[in-house]
Regions:
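ABC-type nucleotide-binding domain
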Residues: 1-205
């Protein structure tokens, strides 16, 4: 968590090895990520970003992007888990509906992206939480899908609203490119530092 421009995206880029650290190291299961190939590292992550995309093709093509041999049964099961089946089955041709960039809403794109990740079930997740640009009902569906997806997985959440990370086991508070505080929600509130100010300013506004 942290204000705009604090380094949250840079942190994720380092985690995914889009570029490497200049000093220090990032360890996953005790191993320096620079000792692992970029392909192997990235394939162990599932990503759901708020500015997600759909490729030109069918709904099925978009969901099976990371698992091209998936059966319809597996796809439908993942879609139900990800709360996207409700809108998919209403599309003119269901899974065979051809999508373009503006065929579905931003929230529906995010639900599709969650379905894609749900189908592959990677060991780690990077989630950029839903924004206020989606309607409340879809936002609740996205949050439910996130909760389902995170069970039993190491998850990194880029949070814009602090209410969504109250149950996180560890919160990293960033400012000006540095981690300035860390702890769980209760610990950080008790410290009365930057997180405390950030949290209360969101609820006051």
């Amino acid at each position: 968590v942290g204000p705009t421009g604090c380094g949250k995206t840079t942190f994720i880029n380092l985690l995914m090895r889009f570029y490497d650290v200049d000093e220090g190291k990032i360890l996953v299961d005790g191993k320096d990520i620079r000792e692992v190939s970029r392909h192997a590292l990235r394939s162990s992550f599932g990503m759901v970003l708020q500015d997600t995309w759909v490729k030109s093709g069918t709904v099925r093509d978009n969901i099976c992007f990371g698992k091209p041999d998936a059966t319809d049964e597996e796809i439908i099961c993942a879609a139900k888990e990800a709360r996207s089946w409700e809108f998919i089955r209403r599309l003119p041709k269901g899974l065979d509906t051809v999508l373009h960039e503006d065929s579905i809403s931003q929230g529906q794109k995010q639900l599709l992206c969650i379905t894609r990740v749900m189908l592959c079930l990677p060991p780690m997740l990077i989630l950029d939480e839903a924004t206020s640009s989606i309607d409340t009902r879809t936002e609740l569906q996205v949050q439910e899908a996130f909760d389902k997806l995170m069970k039993g997985r190491t998850s990194f959440i880029v949070a814009h609203r602090l209410s969504t990370i109250r149950n996180a086991s560890l919160i990293l508070v960033m400012k000006d490119g540095k981690i300035i505080e860390q702890g769980n929600h209760e610990e950080l509130l008790k410290k009365g530092g930057f997180y405390h100010k950030l949290y209360h300013s969101q609820f006051e506004s």
